[in-house]
Design a protein with these regions (language model features):
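Hydrophobic core segments within long, regular secondary-structure runs in both alpha-
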Residues: 12-15, 19, 28-42, 55, ...
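Short linear functional motifs in flexible/disordered or boundary regions
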Residues: 26, 33, 46, 53, ...
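CBM-like carbohydrate-recognition segments
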Residues: 69, 90-201
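Solvent-exposed loop and edge beta-strand segments that line ligand/cofactor-binding
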Residues: 1-10, 27, 38-53, 60-67, ...
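Residue-level signature of the C-terminal ends
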Residues: 21-24, 44, 61-64, 84, ...
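Extended ligand-binding groove/face enriched in aromatic
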Residues: 1-24, 28-32, 71-72, 132-136, ...
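Short, surface-exposed, charged/polar-biased interaction segments
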Residues: 35, 55-58, 62, 75, ...
């Protein structure tokens, strides 16, 4: 039985895992289970959690099931929290993951004749936020000239840390940073993003 205030990170992560399994072997049971869970996310307004795994899920499941409700969920998950993400002083890497996944999904919506669903969302503000986060998160990168001041520079050089949590380095934070930056770089290479940061209104 779930606690009333339990976080939902693992729910989204589990569904994302099912969708990646489906991508590998095309066994319909994975997609059916993911869709059933995603319907639950929609019923219970999970988008209000603004979680990066939910953005990953929405981006992934709409590749196979282009349900407008799924797209709408993904858009709300990001845009309802966009000004907060833009202005946040922490270097949490999941913000970049969330916004980049939303951008990827919105690009597909443009090509799948779903522009009508995009009218209520300021896509330019999403791009500004992505660029701001990509630049800002470098405040949490252990450049050699920073790592040298720590006890074991070789161990942390080139990794990522969370400054407001005592310069903590954890493998999941490093993974989230790499994941976000790889997807960000991919969009830049495709010419789908500008590298210039601007102010979100």
């Amino acid at each position: 039985v779930k606690d009333i205030f339990r976080i939902i990170y693992y729910d989204g992560e589990a569904v994302f895992g099912l969708l990646r399994l489906y991508e590998i072997d095309r066994d319909s049971k994975w997609l059916e289970a993911a869709a059933k869970s995603f319907d639950h996310f929609i019923r219970d307004d999970y988008w209000q959690n603004h979680d990066h795994w939910l953005s990953y899920c929405a981006n992934e499941i709409t590749k196979y099931i282009p349900d407008e409700a799924y797209y709408e969920f993904g858009m709300k998950n990001a845009f309802d929290n966009l000004p907060f993400i833009y202005g946040r002083e922490t270097t949490f890497p999941t913000f970049l993951e969330l916004t980049v996944a939303t951008k990827e999904m919105s690009l597909r919506m443009e090509t799948e004749d779903l522009q009508k669903l995009l009218h209520d969302y300021p896509l330019a503000e999403l791009e500004k936020t992505i660029t701001k986060r990509a630049i800002y998160q470098l405040n949490g990168y252990f450049y050699p000239e920073l790592a040298i001041y720590y006890k074991n520079p070789a161990r942390i050089d080139g990794s990522f840390f969370i400054r407001h949590q005592s310069f903590r380095v954890r493998i999941d934070d490093v993974e989230h940073n790499i994941s976000g930056y790889v997807r960000y770089h991919h969009l830049l290479k495709q010419g789908k993003l500008s590298a210039e940061a601007e102010t979100v209104k």
